[in-house]
Amino acid sequence: MKFTKMHGIGNDYVYVNCFKETVKDPSAVAKFVSDRHFGIGSDGLILLCKSNIADLKMRMFNKDGTEAQMCGNGIRCVAKLAYELGLIERETATIETLSGIKSLKLNITKGKVNNVEVDMGEPILIPEKIPIIKNESVRIEDKKIKAKFKINKKEFEFTCVSIGNPHAVTFVKDLSKIEINKYGPIFENLNIFPEKTNVEFVEIVDKDNIKMRVWERGTGETLACGTGACSSVVAGYLNNFTNRKVNVELLGGNLGVEWRSNNHIYMNLSLIHISEPTRHLRI
């Protein structure tokens, strides 16, 4: 199997061009390639596939083998790789995902993609569509879907958003003091989230800047998460903590996110890195 390993600000995946390769059991392959000791080492597996409704289709698998609806960092890398492999030949692209078709703009210099802007679509703020089960812990304030929990005498309040996949965003005073490996899996598996959830811990710097750490559903903590950054900006604006255009500082680097007046969220990264050359693997 021929593959390429790429990352967007540290959120790394193994990419396979399924226009030429066949992956019979992507769930099993995802588990293998994600292992940082006995595999290749990644946050998961992403397949570039043919589509009948877009330029191509992206399938994304977490490191535990589960298939996810969408990956913001991954889709930018897909666009870059697809262009440089000749699968698309324009500076715009449409990519089919389980959360719908996404539109992308590619900034190209000397045949290489150095910047990708993604239209992530509109945030989903309806409980049944996130999905989240309404109970005594969940309340709705205007457009905000709030959930409050006390764990080990520590209280957390979440704003819940979907960007094609579920996110629970909580705002904290000091991000460096958050025990993400302790609290991340607890919140990921709360029974109010029937499909589990991604979890973002966010520190407000000012109206234009936030810091974020993420616990990804099916993967654990990662260095970056594009849909998580978008969800955090939506939650920040709804709670009057931020403006609509925000710089999001993650462990792997910075992302620019803007929730525009047309209700669409746009995400921009100045450079996407290829961390390893194309390789061959026998599975």
Regions found by a protein language model. Give the residues of each.
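N-terminal, positively charged, Ser/Thr/Ala/Gly-biased leader segments
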Residues: 1-14, 18-20, 118, 142, ...
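N-terminal beta-alpha supersecondary unit
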Residues: 4-52, 190-193
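Acidic, low-complexity central loop/insert segments
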Residues: 63-158, 223, 234-260, 266
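Helical hairpin unit composed of two closely spaced alpha helices linked by a short loop
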Residues: 227-229
